[in-house]
Amino acid sequence: MQIFVKTLTGKTITLEVEPSDTIENVKAKIQDKEGIPPDQQRLIFAGKQLEDGRTLSDYNIQKESTLHLVLRLRGGMQIFVKTLTGKTITLEVEPSDTIENVKAKIQDKEGIPPDQQRLIFAGKQLEDGRTLSDYNIQKESTLHLVLRLRGGMQIFVKTLTGKTITLEVEPSDTIENVKAKIQDKEGIPPDQQRLIFAGKQLEDGRTLSDYNIQKESTLHLVLRLRGGMQIFVKTLTGKTITLEVEPSDTIENVKAKIQDKEGIPPDQQRLIFAGKQLEDGRTLSDYNIQKESTLHLVLRLRGGC
């Protein structure tokens, strides 16, 4: 079959190959055509660098596929840059390259202006004037690229283990967006995350600005152990609302959830269970409210007592 090999200069080479050919064989064919020694060749397909011992069929390279040929500079090295979207960019660099140089290479590949790039390695943000060797970044190291959005801000998320995560966010980001960023960094599924700020649990559909979360604010991350539960809230009109809660949720949290669903301000809500009015600071487990329990909602009229 025929495949194409595109070089960084834009030249396209056509090769006759078999699916069973190894990458090593392909590099030998390129040497025959172009005179480039195999040890200076790097072949990329679908964003992956191809390994010498594997075959074209291992990588699902079919007829008329296009490989990309990158020259491995003597003394140069490859590093990877992973974005928050999960895309991995491969760069050819020298240990003596500055972070500024690396950002320029990323701009060449991806079109992202250097002033919007933040590069992270081993949990540290890298400074423009320092070099890769200053940070002990070696061949095949992976850097993380975070975009510094215009008008964006940094916030911190502290876990129960005491670890602090730094996030780049916008005031207009929803709590759902923030949980997705935490998943990208830490691998924790959003449905297991509960975020707390100023003592309140944050609801997915609301934004950071709704909660007056500003730059360098610290949120607290509590893991929602599988074992969240559903409860029902019945109003005097006979309507039943379903809520997702934790036994550790306070009555105040529950009223906030009702407000999000129904628009009723918490100060107008009275919740009754087993004949008792529930107090804001107590938790569902304090009242032995279990999954599929039904609470009753009575409206406290303005001026009422």
From Swiss-Prot:
Phosphoserine: modified positions: S65, S141
InterPro entries for the chain: Ubiquitin-like_dom, Ubiquitin-like_domsf, Ubiquitin_CS, Ubiquitin_dom, Ubiquitin_ubiquitin-like
Sorted UniProt keywords: ADP-ribosylation, Cytoplasm, Isopeptide bond, Membrane, Mitochondrion, Mitochondrion outer membrane, Nucleus, Phosphoprotein, Repeat, Ubl conjugation
Propeptide: 305
Cross-link for Glycyl lysine isopeptide (Gly-Lys) (interchain with K-? in acceptor proteins), residue positions: G76
Domain Ubiquitin-like: start-end pairs: 1-76, 77-152, 153-228, 229-304
GO molecular function: protein tag activity; structural constituent of ribosome; ubiquitin protein ligase binding
Coiled coil: none
Linked residues for Glycyl lysine isopeptide (Lys-Gly) (interchain with G-Cter in ubiquitin): K6, K11, K27, K29, K33, K48, K63
Post-translational modification ADP-ribosylglycine, affected residues: G76
UniProt site (Essential for function): H68
Pfam families membership: ubiquitin
Keyword presence, Transport: no
Site, as annotated: Interacts with activating enzyme: R54, R72
GO annotation, cellular component aspect: cytoplasm; mitochondrial outer membrane; neuron projection; neuronal cell body; nucleus
One GO term (biological process): regulation of proteasomal protein catabolic process
UniProt xrefs under PANTHER family: UBIQUITIN (PTHR10666)
Subunit details: Interacts with SKP1-KMD2A and SKP1-KMD2B complexes.
Remarks, miscellaneous: Ubiquitin is encoded by 4 different genes. Uba52 and Rps27a genes code for a single copy of ubiquitin fused to the ribosomal proteins eL40 and eS31, respectively. UBB and UBC genes code for a polyubiquitin precursor with exact head to tail repeats, the number of repeats differ between species and strains.
Protein family per UniProt: Belongs to the ubiquitin family.
Protein name per the record: Polyubiquitin-B
The species this protein was found in: Bos taurus (Bovine)
